[in-house]
């Protein structure tokens, strides 16, 4: 896995880079694990825009990803595939009982290796265990927040969390964002780091490539008319005329805290994530 840099053959290739696909072993997805999902393009059931800057993009086929893992059944890695819906790769597993499943591809997991999700599973990349069975300092991903709910944390490309303490019915985990929080020891996690670690190091290079991803242009409020945005209007390049920037609906933006003041997980968070 590496990054390929383009020369300035055209303005669109200047400063552009793409990921190489030499880790992909299969081109077409497993048909039984795919489905089509209607893309709302940011509109609600009345056709009104409820989420701005969405629409267009290349048509995608969704893959069914198993975040819970079949317990106590060994599985063999059949292939490593591309998934257009996420920035990491996915691995196709063939279980001993004939079931096929997709999982997030951990770094270092190759085709032909056997992995298992079990309380007694060995400590190797791709195996899934309860948090209380994992030694301190181990890198983990696909972490559950509630037992049996399926992995919800550390699932992006290159993400890895670290188990740093165990006490009582909780374990302490340092997440990729820098946040340190408590998680029930009965929750499961997968050993290792998510693959495709260079996904965040590419340069988009041109506006059209962002449109392929289904993202539409973002227009500054200060260049709009007063009817469209609180920052709009004025003669020439006018200031926003307010003490703080606001959203199109008048709420304080750019630095305003949006987290609920009394959220259930406040007592579980030891240290908040790093600020941008």
Swiss-Prot record:
It holds the Pfam family Ribosomal_L2. Keywords: Chloroplast, Plastid, Ribonucleoprotein, Ribosomal protein. Gene3D superfamilies: 2.30.30.30, Nucleic acid-binding proteins (2.40.50.140), Ribosomal protein L2, domain 3 (4.10.950.10). It comes from the Eukaryota. One of its GO terms (molecular function) is rRNA binding. One of its GO terms (cellular component) is mitochondrial large ribosomal subunit. InterPro entries: NA-bd_OB-fold, Rib_uL2_dom2, Ribosomal_uL2, Ribosomal_uL2_bac/org-type, Ribosomal_uL2_C, Ribosomal_uL2_CS, Ribosomal_uL2_dom3, Ribosomal_uL2_RNA-bd_dom. This is Large ribosomal subunit protein uL2c. The gene is rpl2. The keyword Ligase does not apply. It is found in: Plastid, Chloroplast. Part of the 50S ribosomal subunit. Its main location: plastid. Residues 225-256 are annotated as: Disordered. Belongs to the universal ribosomal protein uL2 family. Disulfide bonds: none annotated. One of its GO terms (biological process) is mitochondrial translation.
């Amino acid at each position: 896995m590496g990054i390929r840099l383009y020369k300035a053959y055209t303005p669109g290739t200047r400063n552009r880079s793409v990921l190489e696909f030499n880790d992909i072993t299969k081109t077409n997805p497993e048909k039984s694990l795919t489905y089509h999902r209607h893309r709302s393009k940011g509109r609600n059931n009345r056709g009104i825009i409820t989420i701005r800057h969405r629409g267009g993009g290349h048509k995608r086929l969704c893959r069914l990803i198993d975040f819970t893992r079949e317990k106590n059944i060994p599985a063999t890695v059949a292939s490593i595939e591309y998934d257009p819906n996420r920035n990491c790769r996915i691995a196709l597993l063939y279980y001993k009982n004939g079931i096929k499943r997709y999982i997030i591809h951990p770094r270092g997991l190759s085709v032909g290796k056997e992995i298992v999700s079990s309380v007694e599973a060995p400590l190797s990349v791709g195996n899934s265990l309860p948090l209380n069975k994992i030694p301190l300092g181990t890198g983990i991903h696909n972490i559950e927040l509630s037992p049996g709910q399926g992995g919800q944390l550390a699932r992006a490309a290159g993400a890895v969390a670290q188990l740093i303490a165990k006490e009582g019915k909780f374990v302490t985990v340092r997440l990729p964002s820098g946040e340190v929080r408590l998680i029930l020891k009965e929750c499961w996690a997968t050993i290792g780091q998510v693959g495709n670690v260079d996904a965040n190091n590419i340069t988009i290079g041109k506006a059209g490539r962002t449109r392929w991803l289904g993202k539409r242009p973002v227009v500054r409020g200060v260049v709009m008319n007063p009817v469209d945005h609180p920052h709009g209007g004025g003669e020439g390049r006018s200031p926003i005329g307010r003490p703080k920037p606001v959203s199109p609906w008048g709420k304080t933006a750019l630095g305003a805290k949006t987290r609920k003041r009394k959220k259930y997980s406040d007592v579980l968070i030891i240290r908040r994530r790093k600020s941008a």
